[in-house]
Amino acid sequence: MVLINDKKFACEKCIKGHRVSACTHTDRPLFEVKKKGRPSTQCRHCKEKRKSAGSSVHTKCQCGATDPKTLKDILASVNAAHAAANESGGASATANTSAEPEIETRKGQPGSKPTFPRGLKDVHEIAAAANALQGWGEDDQVVKAAERTVQALLNPCKCELGGPCTCCQIKTKPRRKHSGHEFENPASAGATPPGGGCCGSSVHSRDDVATRNSPTSINSSEAIHHPPQTAPMLHKTRLFSPYSTDLRRRDSSSSTGSKTPGWASPRAMRPPVSRIKPLTDMRRLMNAAVNQDGTLASEIPRSVVGLPTLPGIESFNTSANLENGEKSKDVDMPLAFPTSEDVVIGACMCGDDCSCPGCATHDHHNISPSNRTHDGSCGESCKGHNDCAHSIPIPSGVQSIAQLICIAASQVPPPPPNRTDSLNPHDTRILPPSVSLSEDVARTMGIVPLKPLECCGGKCGCPPGECACTKQCCGCCGECTCEKDEDTRMEEEGEYTESARDVTTSSCGGCKGKEKQSGFSDMMSPQIPQSVSPTSYHVPPLQPKPLNLPVSTIHHSTLSPSFNTPQPSPPAVSSPADSLSMAVHPSNGPNVRPVPMIQPRPILPKRASDTGLVMPQGSRPPSALGRSGSMTATKRSGTSTGVRRSNSDVRKVVGPSQPHHRPSIQSSSDRSFYIGSPSNQIAPGGVPMASAPSQMTAPLNSADSNSDLLAFIQQQWSADKTSNSNSDMNPSHPTMPVSLTAEPWAFPPQNETTDDSAPVPFDLDAFLMSIGVQPDGELRNDRPLSSQPPQSLMPNIPPTQPIAPLPPIPPSMSDVRPGYDMTFANFFLNSTPSGPSGPSAIPATNIPSRHTTPQASRPLTPPESSFTEPPRWKFPGDLGGEIPIWNGPEALEGFGVLGSPVSEKEEVTEESQNEKDIIDLSKPLDSAALTKIMKALEKQGGGQSSSQGAPSVANTDQQLQSLPALQTVPPVHPASVISPTRADPAHELDDMFSQFVTLDGTPIGSNNDGLGLNGGPGMMALPTNLSLGDELGFGGEMRWDQARMWSN
């Protein structure tokens, strides 16, 4: 059912089929559905009068014209526009519509003419007409949306007769038919109440407005019956509208007004546009229509085109707003497209603060239109540089925002012509195009290119016009402050950052004067020494050592490829630490603040017995000291005790040759291949204690960072070789081999003297005695133990504590294949090269508790990642303070398998050992394991069996081939082996392994090669280990339980 303004409409077929409530055919002609019952014979006004108390005015309604205008006549004007489109068909349809009389139909039948011939299309057109009429009534006040309905437009009077309201008018004579003007009112109309008649409607039909627009109808009875709503009590605010119906304003401007050609609206009554003040300008429209990113907005408000805003919902309740003292707020709705209003926009682009005289939008000077004269420009103060008095008319029917902008932009006035008496230097439009093509033409026209701010990186501090900086100036332009943070930068910046800073620092001297511009040629006296190592590394030139400086200064000067600042007369020093030389990097200038250099690494002698040791590829690196101890080294003659001062740290030196490391400042480039050495802590007894091992901060095998270190070490050894004449080193052997993986703290420094004597070689035996190691293998009780905790604290050692490196491999083992791990367990069980991360530790679950030592239960840490001092072992008191050496076929009393100490009350027998042994199931079972299994089964079943079982011959070879490498335990023997009984270096290495391995019942001098298990070939009998078995003396036949391994 189609319901319009509380009236039912339906199509013809639905009315005939009695389906009015179900009709939804909005595209068909709609007929009004009459109410049931007898039609009313009186108007609403007469009904109200009759119902009033004591009223007897009339019993029959005589109000209105005798032939009132029907609804069909009102819609005739609407249909005329569509009829004009169809010239032939539309004209005939209009003639037939006016000629065909309306036939009354009975109830339930549609009328002869539909109310809306085109369905809801007519309803929409009437609604659009209602929007077009806003502003015509109530003297510039917006028509309320609730009153702009179809019913109010079709029936402006509440008497619902459809035509001009004639209620309350006494008919004196019959009214004649409308001959000329159908809306003409009789002259003899009676007076109407001052209140406005019976309807009191504020909405007038289109014909009423047309009648009131004529000057002759101002004093007519129609105007009196419907007076203009100009009473002040009906207006809350007085708003200006370009479509004002004020006749006096309209008449005052009608004589001088002219029609603008841009208007194309079909409406006949249109106010003159040129004299209507625009409510908006072009700048406000462009700001609302164009976003900041240059795109068009999706919608624009109505106010930007000059249309008034719509009242809010709360504004309808006028009485409530007046009582509460609230003001109604209008709603600025978006502009609907296509537009149905004609608007005027000002061409001003200055904004709200425009001060141009005669501006159409911002007329602050109140210049009358008759006196307004404009020469085409607003003057120099105009921000828009155009004619602000110009107006831009925008007709209705605009379809989009883009079309609105195009219409407005096409009517913007052109910019004013340039005046010849004034020249704007910033206006480049007056220059010829050849200025941008030729520099000569640009210079002729007065365009001078400015010098770019290249000096000091844009931070020049010189006075204007007095800059004497060079191109490489850092920007200080005076006292350079670039190196104030040098100590911090050496700790934080890398090698490349330091070199980049040196380039900047060297440019600081360009601004300070002639005395600071000395080059590097005065500093450099290149004397390239002969390199002793046949390497391809480049050795940078070094400054020759001054003859009047002590040995410590010489070490400092040769530590890194640096240059000493030449001093004509070095000051006298009282101690070696006071004579630190101030080194300057070659790329730094002479004006750099000197920095104390790093403590040099000392020179260590090499024994003749150690020069032949060659480390196999893939094996462990040498120990921390790089050598095995020797009690026969040449001792120093004489002692010297003094106080060394290094910065603010004073440390006492006790002993003949105690190593001492001076804390020094290291740059990050040095740390790239240096390992932080453990700082020595002075104990109460005067003995240095090693702190926790420092971790590696950078890979040591970096070729880029190691090249400089290798070159420095080569230079150091070559420079000190000539001055080291009193050393005990064998001149026939080469000097100490340079290893890139060696630690910087692995070389204890020499005792420095104040004279010019050569450095004395380091005495290892004296050093070991100073730290508490006696020649008989004991630790002195008056010295605190630094590297090994007490025996009571051994179970509390964390499992991640690093261990000491392994001793060097003897020369007789050089033919062992690479990767062979020289731990004592590998002497019997391991023949597979260890992995890159070092040998793994044997699980603690495979070793009995009584055969497990704290060192053996710890996992092995790769020697590259941790460094400690060599552990010093304290043996039981019953050994007499000597390292036990196996010299007989019996097992050493007090020690069991794997070297774990055993109680004296416990008897170590073969039967108890067999009961305590555990079979390792991680490797294939051999004959010994099968024998133990058989013995266990016999004991469990109560039976007796032979103690020896013959292994399977068929499975022996297969088991040996598939035998995996057994995981080994960490070494528990010290890194530096001190032989208390033998002084011959040739026999030290031969006796080293006999100190840790005992063979029960097998003489050392056996001629059998390899180690056998019950007569079969063992692991040590492999082809790669034949010579190793001979060297170690592990020949002959022995059972699995005959090997005894222990450690001190």
From Swiss-Prot:
Composition-biased stretches (Low complexity): 85-99, 835-845
Polar residues bias locations: 211-222, 527-536, 550-565, 629-645, 664-682, 692-702, 846-868
Pfam families: Copper-fist
Keywords in alphabetical order: Copper, Cytoplasm, Metal-binding, Nucleus, Transcription, Transcription regulation, Zinc
Subcellular location: Nucleus; Cytoplasm, Cell cortex
Region ranges (Disordered): 85-117, 178-273, 506-702, 835-876
One record GO biological process: intracellular copper ion homeostasis
Superkingdom, taxonomy of origin: Eukaryota
Gene disruption: observed consequences: Leads to a clear defect in the ability to grow in both copper excess or copper deficiency conditions. Impairs the activation of laccase LAC1 transcription by copper. Also reduces the expression of the genes coding for the copper transporters CTR1 and CTR4, and the metallothioneins CMT1 and CMT2. Impairs the induction of the copper acquisition factor BIM1 under copper-limiting conditions. Impairs induction of super oxide dismutase SOD2 under copper-limiting conditions. Impairs repression of super oxide dismutase SOD1 under copper-limiting conditions.
Positions that bind Zn(2+): 11, 14, 23, 25
Gene3D superfamilies: Copper fist DNA-binding domain
Annotated DNA-binding residue span(s): 1-40
Keyword Nucleus annotated: yes
Ion transport found in the keyword field: no
Motif stretch (CRM-I): 348-362
Signal sequence, renumbered to the chain: none
GO MF, one annotated term: RNA polymerase II cis-regulatory region sequence-specific DNA binding
GO cellular component, one term: nucleus
Major subcellular location class: nucleus
Free-text function comment from the UniProt entry: Transcription factor that regulates copper acquisition and homeostasis, and which plays a central role in fungal pathogenesis during neurologic infection. The transcriptional regulation exerted by CUF1 is intrinsically complex since it acts as a dual sensor of copper levels, responsible for expression of a set of copper-specific copper transporters, CTR1 and CTR4, at low copper concentrations, and 2 metallothioneins, CMT1 and CMT2, at high copper concentrations. Positively regulates the expression of the copper acquisition factor BIM1 under copper-limiting conditions.
Free-text comment on this protein's domains from its UniProt entry: The CRM-I motif (C-X-C-X3-C-X-C-X2-C-X2-H) and CRM-II motif (C-C-X3-C-X-C-X4-C-X-C-X3-C-C-X-C-C-X2-C-X-C) correspond to cystein-rich copper-binding domains.
UniProt-recorded name of the protein: Copper-dependent transcription factor 1
Taxon lineage: Eukaryota, Fungi, Dikarya, Basidiomycota, Agaricomycotina
Name of the coding gene: CUF1
